[in-house]
């Protein structure tokens, strides 16, 4: 699926004394298989932006366009065939977007406090709720639940448990499994690691990486720039409802002056690397702690060998 936003503007409480414009002329597109990090200060418009991606919000002005493959019934051959579909909102004012189901089953959104989305008596019922609502056979949905509960790192036995007996991190995994069970083309996650312990953070990020490697589009809204540096292939920076940067993670996040000018804390990894470079250590481009540790080990080994040979 390809998503295109063209000159999207959005105003809350339009024509009232509480009117507030949250997005100003947003232009960007996301292609199938990308891993995009979206960053910016609180109030920069990140959540408002992603709510346009699956038609939870409709632009005040501008357009959102979705291009995707779908199956239609061919009356001539009496068989289903695959076609490319283009849906657009914003070309004319409508109260209700008719294609919302087709869009939302292809673009799954896991919000920051996803655990509050759980409301059924069992984990199984919660996971299959979305797929069944969008037309999946209940038996097939149960098989998807068994598949994705394991993918998010929970045993199948958890399907029988009440979601309200789970920890916050476990609830978030169940909410993620519920979205994945719909098998969307695009997965949008809003602060997916907030409040998790380091091991939980790594597991969630590994799941997102695995999904990306399997061909899904990942859009990760986060305050943790180290996660964007290590995992994302593209980063979008928002400020006051505008995109002020759209580029490669390393080049963008290593621009310390740009980050500080926009009140963003540089990644801890690059802070440390830049301190080493300031002391004359020629550290190469690294994007993860593992890469840095590996390079330091090689560097120290080479340095020690030179010192021994000079004795």
Curated annotation (Swiss-Prot):
Its main location: membrane. It is a peripheral membrane protein. Its EC number is 7.-.-.-. One of its GO terms (cellular component) is ATP-binding cassette (ABC) transporter complex. ATP binds at residues 40-47. It is found in: Cell membrane. Pfam families: ABC_tran (PF00005). The keyword Transport applies. Residues 3-265 form the ABC transporter domain. PROSITE patterns: ABC_TRANSPORTER_1, ABC_TRANSPORTER_2, CBIO. The keyword Membrane applies. Keywords: ATP-binding, Cell membrane, Membrane, Nucleotide-binding, Translocase, Transport. GO terms for molecular function: ATP binding; ATP hydrolysis activity; ATPase-coupled transmembrane transporter activity. SMART domains: AAA (SM00382). Belongs to the ABC transporter superfamily. Energy-coupling factor EcfA family. ATP-binding (A) component of a common energy-coupling factor (ECF) ABC-transporter complex. Unlike classic ABC transporters this ECF transporter provides the energy necessary to transport a number of different substrates. Forms a stable energy-coupling factor (ECF) transporter complex composed of 2 membrane-embedded substrate-binding proteins (S component), 2 ATP-binding proteins (A component) and 2 transmembrane proteins (T component). This is Energy-coupling factor transporter ATP-binding protein EcfA2. The gene is ecfA2.
């Amino acid at each position: 699926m390809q998503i295109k936003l063209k000159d999207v503007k959005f105003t809350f409480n339009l024509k009232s004394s509480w009117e507030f414009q949250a997005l100003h002329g947003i232009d960007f597109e996301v292609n199938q298989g990308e891993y995009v990090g979206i960053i910016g200060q609180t109030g920069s418009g990140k959540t408002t932006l992603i709510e346009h991606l699956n038609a939870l919000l409709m632009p005040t002005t501008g357009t959102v366009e979705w291009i995707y493959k779908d199956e239609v019934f061919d009356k001539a051959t009496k068989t289903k065939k695959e076609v490319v579909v283009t849906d657009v909102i914003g070309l004319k004012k409508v109260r209700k977007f008719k294609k919302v189901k087709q869009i939302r089953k292809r673009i799954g959104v896991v919000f920051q406090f996803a655990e509050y989305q759980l409301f059924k008596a069992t984990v199984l019922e919660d996971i299959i709720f979305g797929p069944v609502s969008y037309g999946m056979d209940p038996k097939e949905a149960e098989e998807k639940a068994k598949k994705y509960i394991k993918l998010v790192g929970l045993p199948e036995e958890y399907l029988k448990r009440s979601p309200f007996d789970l920890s916050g991190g476990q609830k978030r995994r169940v909410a993620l499994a519920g979205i994945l069970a719909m098998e969307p083309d695009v997965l949008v996650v809003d602060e997916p690691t907030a409040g998790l312990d380091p091991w939980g953070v790594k597991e969630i990020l590994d799941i997102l990486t695995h999904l990306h490697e399997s061909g899904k589009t990942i859009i990760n809204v986060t305050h943790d720039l180290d996660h964007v540096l290590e995992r994302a292939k593209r980063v979008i920076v928002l400020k006051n409802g505008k995109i002020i940067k759209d580029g490669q993670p390393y080049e963008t996040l290593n621009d310390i002056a740009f980050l500080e000018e926009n009140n963003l804390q540089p990644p801890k990894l690059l802070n440390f690397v830049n301190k080493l470079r300031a002391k004359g250590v020629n550290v190469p481009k690294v994007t993860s702690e593992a890469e840095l540790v590996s390079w330091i080990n090689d560097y120290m080994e080479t340095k020690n060998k030179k010192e021994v040979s000079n004795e």
